[in-house]
Amino acid sequence: MMTYIVFILSTVFVVSFVSFSSKPSPIYGGFGFNVAGGIGCGIVLNFGGSFLGLMVFLIYLGGMLVVFGYTTAMATEPYPEAWTSNKAVLAMFITGVLAELLTACYILKEDEVEVVFKFNGAGDWVIYDTGDSGFFSEEAMGIAALYSYGTWLVVVTGWSLLIGVLVIMEVTRGN
Amino acid sequence: MNPPIFIIIMLTVISGTMIVVTTSHWLLVWIGFEMNLLAIIPILMKKYNPRAMEAATKYFLTQAAASMILMMWIIINLLHSGQWTVLKDLNPMASIMMTTALAMKLGLAPFHFWVPEVTQGISMSSGLILLTWQKIAPLSILYQISSTINPNLILTMSILSVMIGGWGGLNQTQLRKIMAYSSIAHMGWMTAIMMYSPTMMILNLTIYIIMTLTTFMLFMHNSTTTTASLSQTWNKTPLITSLILVLMMSLGGLPPLSGFIPKWMIIQELTKNELIMMPTLLAMTALLNLYFYMRLTYTTALTMFPSNNSMKMKWRFECTKKMTFLPPLVVMSTMLLPLAPMLSILD
């Protein structure tokens, strides 16, 4: 199973995206969001990015999604819609899950699949230890490069985050 | 809006576009587009009515979807070429989809449906920024990938845009919607020439921005948003009446005004590349555009539109709006044709 772990995690990732894309109430959607975040962390971990995967848990799930959860709790409605509450949400959910399962079965059955790029069945999702990255992990070197050579990128992303907050406040200010 | 916040937000809109225009890394292109989008949302929502909120939401959704498509194909291009540099040799499939994503951002047909509705829902000055500044970033990326764009795709989109810009604007009385359809048609002209001579696209963009800027400023001068209220400008500011006449003729692409320069150059470049039907079709459908500009001219400057007698006798107050740079802009939008021989420096 460990050879196909990335493939399995990707499939469950898509299913959890379907679970909040079928638009239940935000409380239930938030649950799907959390699961998706955790699985995304797992996928990143499997590619060797241990620091970034745990950053996903810490900052994304533990920071941003917690704030999302609190604001959703403040804006809650008396009769929230779950996935089986009305037929539209259920139909969308079933459609999404069915599409994903059919895609997964197609990938597993056929030897070679070409959707946008060719890959050989599920075997291409396996991470072999190709290439000699030396004693340092590439991911940690990438983060180090961000804070040394990539100062401009830090400035741009930091400014974008600040602007995100200012824009949200300006939009919700009203009057 | 609170002045310091307004300054910061305008700064971000400008720097977002500048990042897209000047960068050589695909990730920064996407970041620049997102910065631009995020910061322009409060500008679109300057007035807090539901119409403006709806327009800002529509703009956000379409542009965010386009950015997502662009990002996906940036990553697939990375998969095939192994590097992040914005070069001219893209994977062909990535080039097609990136062109589609950028066409969604520009408002080219068949992705033009958001342009009239968003432009109508926002204030005149926000519409000005939307139709002029926001076109610079996507067109700069199209300029950079122009040698690998699929001809069938881009020429289809451009002919469709000119046609839809012409026919769509015919039944409009709201000035912002007229300007939106005018923008769709001009984008069609710009993308038609992009594959053959990207420099002419820049020329068209420059002259289009100058003309649209002037038009919006003249509309803002009297706070007119409909044809009916524009038809009363002879009473409020007679000078604007004659300026609207000249400007509409320039927008329609009539010689001897500057609006003729891009059309002339584009038709010349297209015929040099042995396309005959295409510039014929473009020129003929541009006449539809000219028809509704003529209608505006007719009601504004050439006839006295029906109104009550009390509307024919108004006090003439001095305009308190700060119309920076308007006289030079009017001159540039109408009198640049004699300078057209300077384009020979391009050879």
From Swiss-Prot, chain B:
Please provide, in alphabetical order, the Gene Ontology terms of the cellular component aspect for this entry.
Answer: mitochondrial inner membrane; respiratory chain complex I
Any single GO BP term: mitochondrial electron transport, NADH to ubiquinone
* UniProt catalytic activity: a ubiquinone + NADH + 5 H(+)(in) = a ubiquinol + NAD(+) + 4 H(+)(out)
Q: Does the keyword Hydrolase apply?
A: no
Q: Give the E.C. number(s).
A: 7.1.1.2
Keyword terms, alphabetized:
Electron transport, Membrane, Mitochondrion, Mitochondrion inner membrane, NAD, Respiratory chain, Translocase, Transmembrane, Transmembrane helix, Transport, Ubiquinone
Q: What is its main location?
A: mitochondrion
Bilayer topology:
Multi-pass membrane protein
User: Pfam families, per this entry?
Assistant: NADH_dehy_S2_C (PF06444), Proton_antipo_M (PF00361)
Taxonomy, superkingdom: Eukaryota
| Keyword Heme tagged | no
Q: Membrane spanning segments where?
A: 3-23, 25-45, 59-79, 96-116, 122-142, 149-169, 178-198, 200-220, 242-262, 274-294, 325-345
- The EC class name is translocase
Question: Where does the record say this protein resides?
Answer: Mitochondrion inner membrane
Which GO-annotated molecular functions does the record name?
NADH dehydrogenase (ubiquinone) activity
Query: Which family would the database say this protein is a member of?
Result: Belongs to the complex I subunit 2 family.
Record note on quaternary structure: Core subunit of respiratory chain NADH dehydrogenase (Complex I) which is composed of 45 different subunits. Interacts with TMEM242.
Stated role:
Core subunit of the mitochondrial membrane respiratory chain NADH dehydrogenase (Complex I) which catalyzes electron transfer from NADH through the respiratory chain, using ubiquinone as an electron acceptor. Essential for the catalytic activity and assembly of complex I.
Q: What is this protein called?
A: NADH-ubiquinone oxidoreductase chain 2
Species this chain originates from: Felis catus
Lineage in the entry? Eukaryota, Metazoa, Chordata, Craniata, Vertebrata
